[in-house]
Curated annotation (Swiss-Prot):
It is a single-pass membrane protein. This is Biosynthetic peptidoglycan transglycosylase. Belongs to the glycosyltransferase 51 family. The keyword Transmembrane helix applies. Peptidoglycan polymerase that catalyzes glycan chain elongation from lipid-linked precursors. It is an enzyme of class 2 (transferase). The chain crosses the membrane at residues 7-29. InterPro entries: Glyco_trans_51, Lysozyme-like_dom_sf, PBP_transglycosylase, Pep_trsgly. The lineage of its organism: Bacteria, Pseudomonadati, Pseudomonadota, Alphaproteobacteria, Hyphomicrobiales. It is found in: Cell inner membrane. Pathway: Cell wall biogenesis; peptidoglycan biosynthesis. The gene is mtgA. One of its GO terms (molecular function) is peptidoglycan glycosyltransferase activity. Keywords: Cell inner membrane, Cell membrane, Cell shape, Cell wall biogenesis/degradation, Glycosyltransferase, Membrane, Peptidoglycan synthesis, Transferase, Transmembrane, Transmembrane helix. It holds the Pfam family Transgly.
Amino acid sequence: MRRAIRVMALSAIGLLLLPYLLTPLYRIGHPVSTLMIWRTLSGAPMSRQWIDFAALPPSLPRSVVASEDAKFCSHQGIDWDSLREVLDDAEDGEFKRGGSTITQQVAKNLFLWPGRSMVRKALEFPLAMWIDAVLSKQRILEIYLNIAEWGPGGQFGVEAGSRYAFGRSAASLTAREAALMAAILPNPVRRSARKPGPGVRRLAGTYMARARAAELRGCWSGNRSL
């Protein structure tokens, strides 16, 4: 009995440590998300074509950061200020989207499971800080752009999403199209860059303006110049 308990405990510890051991390996390569794996195993539609960060127009990562994580360049994986605002709103009975950084979403997508769970959040926080410490901001963003869900039919990554929405590679997106892609996050099933409604178009205009902010121009390196 004790041996079985010991084996179970060691197995649990091993599972908890596995993401921390795998993270340094993700400095290179084309990692996939747990949702992509699940859809493949279950036979659900899934398409993804990796695109390198350097091939993307600068407006795309800037628009996504403006949309999803305005403090991406300055935080260490967790945006504590935004998190406190979300908690304060929850105490007041207001449940708003927000609080999860791009780094947290990478942690969840690579190693954890979707849906709301206190257990998942407890695992996600230290993992996001570890990812931020081990990977560069550019690499974190590159992974996010290639594993986020970006279409209603199992399109994962901005390349598959761009080909679905506009019929061409993400490498050739205009600033307006890049902002539309950012505007459909985090719900590309209900929102559409292909046939954007008034709300999506309004958000895209906001993100286009935010993407020009000076602080987003020096956050990462290696992207082709404007």
